[in-house]
Amino acid sequence: MAEASSANLGSGCEEKRHEGSSSESVPPGTTISRVKLLDTMVDTFLQKLVAAGSYQRFTDCYKCFYQLQPAMTQQIYDKFIAQLQTSIREEISDIKEEGNLEAVLNALDKIVEEGKVRKEPAWRPSGIPEKDLHSVMAPYFLQQRDTLRRHVQKQEAENQQLADAVLAGRRQVEELQLQVQAQQQAWQALHREQRELVAVLREPE
């Protein structure tokens, strides 16, 4: 029974492999996207993994249990293989999402396609290291300089806004101080007038 199950599993893998190869067949010269190649590599890996962990090897590891419960052993093996494939596919999907691999691979495909239709000759070293280094590094440093300059200008503008806000706050404080002084002087003048009025009222006739 183990041999029959192993044979059935192997034939199933072979059928899937032939189906995959027929569906994945493309005309010569056709470029396959890197995302498609990655998915094909994952499928091939899973097929080889299932082939390496055949049912025959599984039953060899659990001979006693297989002799007692052959049907249960088959069910456990099928469930184990299915969960293993699902777990691997989910892990690879998480890696693709975390690394944004599909976007990166599609960008690489786009760069390659643009390079095919590019008319100007590709860059080649001149044989003079200093010249080659300058031609490569100079644009990079110029770009970095422009980036830093924009950051500096942005920071200066923010600093100027903060300085203007501080000056406006100082003016408000000064105005409040003047208002307080004016109110204090007015209160003192009113207090003097009240005292003078009280003194006048207390004078004998």
From Swiss-Prot:
What is the organism lineage in this UniProt record?
Eukaryota, Metazoa, Chordata, Craniata, Vertebrata
GO terms for cellular component: cytosol; Golgi apparatus; intracellular membrane-bounded organelle; kinetochore; MIS12/MIND type complex; nucleoplasm; nucleus; outer kinetochore
Subunit structure and binding partners: Component of the MIS12 complex composed of MIS12, DSN1, NSL1 and PMF1. Interacts with COPS7A. Interacts via its coiled-coil domain with the leucine-zipper domain of NFE2L2. The interaction with NFE2L2 is required for the transcriptional regulation of SSAT.
Q: Which GO terms describe its molecular function?
A: leucine zipper domain binding; transcription coactivator activity
Output the superkingdom of the source species: Eukaryota
This chain belongs to which protein, by name? Polyamine-modulated factor 1
Q: Name one Pfam family in it.
A: Nnf1
Name the segments for region: Disordered.
Answer: 1-30
- Using the UniProt record, give the first listed, main subcellular location: nucleus
What this protein is reported to do is described as:
Part of the MIS12 complex which is required for normal chromosome alignment and segregation and kinetochore formation during mitosis. May act as a cotranscription partner of NFE2L2 involved in regulation of polyamine-induced transcription of SSAT.
An example GO biological process term is:
chromosome segregation
Q: What tissue specificity does the UniProt entry give? A: Highest levels of expression in heart and skeletal muscle, with significant levels expressed in kidney and liver.
